[in-house]
Structures are given as structure tokens and as C-alpha cells.
Amino acid sequence: AWLSVNLLTQLRRETAACTAVLPYVLRRGCTRLPDLEAIAAELDGLYGAHITPVVHKLGEIQAVGFEADFADDGALGEEIFPRLAADVADLLLHPNTRGGLLRPDIVDSERTQLIARIRAAVNNKRSYARERLYTHMCCCEDFAVPRLGEEADAERIHYRKLTMRYHDLLSTSPVEIFYCGSIDGKRVARILTDVLSTMPRGALDEDIGTDIRMNALEEQPRYVTETLPVAQAQLAVGYRLGTCMEDPDLPVLFVLNALYGGCVTSKLFLNLRERLSLCYSVGSQLDTHKGLLTVTSGIAANHYERALTEITAQLDAVRSGDFTDEELRCAIRSAAGDLRARADAPDTLAWYWLNRTVQGLDIDPPEMAALVEEVTRDDVMSAAAGIVCDCVY
């Protein structure tokens, strides 16, 4: 079974690192389970359950909290969920403090770990290139802030300031809780309401959300080059989805992405990698919160011009309807299959619902997959028509 508790807050440069370190600090212990050893013993008693700190970025919203992976009561024939829910609530609400402040030794230790995580981002060159693209492409927007914040801000984390941020988050953040398991929903709600009843709540921050920019920042795409000692160059191209984000039709966007570069039968994969051998890897990613389509590709540096030309040409082909019925069928099958697979594992299902909830949508994965299967050629061409290239990294 699965439980996730997420506190939502606006992603801002000045608070991102502070917010990102919090679940790691809280996971180190609470008044009832004061250290990692006590927590480990408690979780062993719950058949090896896991409670993990999480930091997500959903458009310009930062979500922090805990995920718990544990044996389902129905399979065990005994109740462990109430105890596990109490453990998660205690870690969240009753942290290890000294004089009413988060413990300096724990904060210092987790600050060092956070800085190490931020520095390690460069090791995954593909996702690093995408993050650097966002930094330049969305330079005037909150979306430019990385999920874990900036290293310079992480270095300034102090236990007094972090304690203030913690109390602020608890009282003002909307909270999204997802449970996946065999217990009746009403009973789950009762248990969670009970264990979280001491959570201090003030005026909720109703202003959190993502600002969607329809057009590129400048008339012509911007080009950014950074030099790193790498065996394989990384090319990342950022597009704004444009006018279709005025009333986004997610099923159409899922099919558009699958057709363009989101699966192994896509335009980008079959042409850039298979037919022309211009890259080692290529794919497109969709951010439906922010209205972005991103292409990332591992290339030989001397293939840069040709690869960029071909990436543009394949999007033009999607725009003009230059794709076969079979290509469209494969894209629909891939997008629908991905959605149905989300329901197969509790973690991917909870992640799906967190995204939909933030978007204000109440459509489950099978329903979304059914809508994907109704997408037409004209739908895809219409959505692709407004896409504009903003930045090339």
C-alpha cells in the first residue's frame, strides 16, 4: 500500500532550498522516535515499511512531504495503517527540537547533504541540460528555479530561519494526501484526520499556481552554449505550447508528444536516431503545468547544426500532418498504454493524481486513456500549430 502527504507552496528562489531541505530534516526524528535508529526499529515492526522524504516540482509549485510504502492491511490480515499514519504525522508535526527550534546539528548535516544533491545534478547530463535550458528559457519566471533550489541559497540555510519556514509551511500550505490500498476510503479519512488533528492551520495560501506564458520571450529563438568536459554533447530545445494552453486538452497533448518524440515509434526517434544516426539518444518531454515541450538529445558536437535542423523539421511535419495513420495509431497506443500503466503501481498512481489535482482535474488514468484513444489527426495538427521555439541550449 502507499501513502503520500504533500505540502504545496509557491516555488520561489528565496524559499526553494529552505523548503527542499525540510522533509529531510523532519525525517531524522520526532519526539516519540528521536533518531534514525528508533525510526528504523519502528518501521521494522511494520513489516519493513519505508517512509521517504520527497521534493517535487509541479510547474511553479513546490511540493514537499513524505511517501510511505508498506504492506497492505488486507494482505496481512492485521491493521498496520493506523500506526504507520501516526508515524508519518509525528515526523511531520512533532519534530526533534531544542528550545523550540529545529536542532542545529541536524539542520547543518542535512544542509550539507542538500548541497551535495544540488551539485550531483550535473552527473545526469540529460536532465542537467533540460534544467539549464529552463534556467535560460524561463529566466524571468519562477519556473527557472530548480526543484531543490540554488546552491548559494542552500549554503545560507540556518536553523532559526528554517524553523520559521517550517511553521509557515504547516499553517499556510494546501495539503494533498493520497492513499492507495484496500482500506475503505472513509475509514482512511477518519484515521488521517485523527492523526493530523494537531496540525496548526492559519489562512491558507490561495495564490499558489503556475503562470503560463503563451509566446516566446523574444521574436527569434535564443541560443545558449555552455562548455563542460563531456564525451557526448547535449542539445536541449525548448518550445512554448502557445495558444492551445488557453484551454489545454491533455489527451491531445499526450498524443502530440508521443508522436513527436515521446516513444520509440516517434518522429524524432525513428528519424534522428534510426534513419540519420545524428544522436545517441533523443526524446521529447511535456510539461502540461507550464505549457512547455522540450526535446533533449545526446549528440556528437559536430552534428549540432544537422540535429537542430532535423528536430525542427520533424515538428514541422507534425504541424502539417505529414505523418501516416500508422504513426498516429502507434502514438495513441503508446500514450494510452502509459496512462493505463500508471494505475498498476501505487507510487505512479499517486504521482498521476497529484499532478491532476494541482491542475484541478478529476479524471482517472483509464478515463484519460479512453479520451486519448479518441484523438484525431486534426486535433494533433491544431495543437501543434501554435507551438513556438523559445530557446536552444
Question: Each PLM stretch: what is its role?
Answer:
Residues 1-19, 36-90, 117, 126-152, ...:
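M16 family metallopeptidases and their MPP-like homologs
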Residues 19-27:
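Active-site SXXK
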Residues 29-32, 73-77, 94-103:
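Short, polar/flexible loop-turn hinges at active-site or ligand-entry regions and domain interfaces
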Residues 105, 207-220, 326-337:
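Short proline/glycine- and acidic-rich turn/helix-capping motifs at secondary-structure junctions
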Residues 159-195, 392-393:
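Non-catalytic, conformational "gating/processing" segments within enzyme and secreted inhibitor domains
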